């Protein structure tokens, strides 16, 4: 999907989380009668969490959580027309129109019809392994592809529209969008370890800005990229 949202460039970091929320909203109806719920995981995963963690084999760093989808984004800055000069916007400026706005290529991958033995890692899951498709009660995996794609497009358009209405600030106008993002984010409130580009950091995940805010013994710090795993607390 190609998006040119009318928000300041400094707010574009929210887009992968918004994309994850759109996927979560699209998949939730498919599992509503199953012992699973769908959430997001910072920075760009969509996961299924079991109602009864003891009923699912635990995977180190993931417990009973299973990754069922992921969101990737790539930023492309606007180019000048032939013979012209591209206008450079300040990070806090809203583009006047979509031609002036940076282009964000959003890629979404959803595990739909894979059997357990077809999944690449122990912490992966699919709509099939959750029991949402191909079980007789749910849609056929081929039909589910169209259902999921249509729903993701619908929810993403709605969320991006709400995001534009608040000028890219998810905590503006009462903060309803920010609350939804945080409520869906399963990372918050957990002791985690982040393998960041500059090393490993551990702490309590307390917020997103959209960077992940970790509370450590040295104070709060923001992590802008990295792989997150759960830390098992002893005792």
What do the PLM-derived regions correspond to, one by one?
Residues 1-2:
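Structural signature of FAD isoalloxazine-binding scaffolds in flavoprotein oxidoreductases
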Residues 7-9, 13-37, 48-235:
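Long, positively charged amphipathic alpha-helical accessory segments at protein N-termini or as interdomain linkers
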């Amino acid at each position: 999907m190609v998006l040119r949202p009318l928000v300041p460039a400094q707010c574009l970091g929210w887009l992968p989380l918004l994309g994850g929320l759109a996927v979560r909203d699209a998949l939730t109806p498919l599992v509503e009668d199953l012992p699973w719920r769908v959430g997001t995981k910072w920075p760009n995963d969509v996961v299924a969490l079991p109602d009864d963690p003891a009923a699912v084999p635990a995977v180190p760093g993931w417990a009973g959580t299973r990754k069922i989808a992921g969101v990737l984004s790539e930023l492309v800055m606007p180019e000048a027309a032939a013979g012209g000069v591209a206008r450079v916007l300040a990070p806090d400026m809203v583009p006047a129109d979509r031609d002036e706005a940076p282009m964000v290529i959003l890629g979404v991958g959803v595990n739909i019809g894979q059997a357990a033995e077809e999944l690449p890692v122990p912490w992966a899951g699919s709509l099939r392994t959750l029991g949402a498709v191909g079980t007789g009660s749910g849609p056929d995996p081929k039909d589910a592809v169209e259902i999921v794609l249509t729903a993701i497009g619908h929810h993403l358009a709605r969320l991006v529209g709400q995001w534009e209405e608040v000028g890219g600030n998810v905590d503006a106008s009462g903060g309803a969008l920010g609350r939804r993002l945080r409520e869906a984010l399963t990372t918050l409130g957990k002791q985690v370890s982040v393998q960041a580009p500059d090393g490993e950091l551990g702490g309590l995940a307390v917020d997103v800005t959209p960077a992940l805010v970790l509370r450590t013994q040295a104070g709060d710090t923001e992590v802008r990229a990295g792989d997150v795993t759960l830390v098992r607390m002893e005792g």
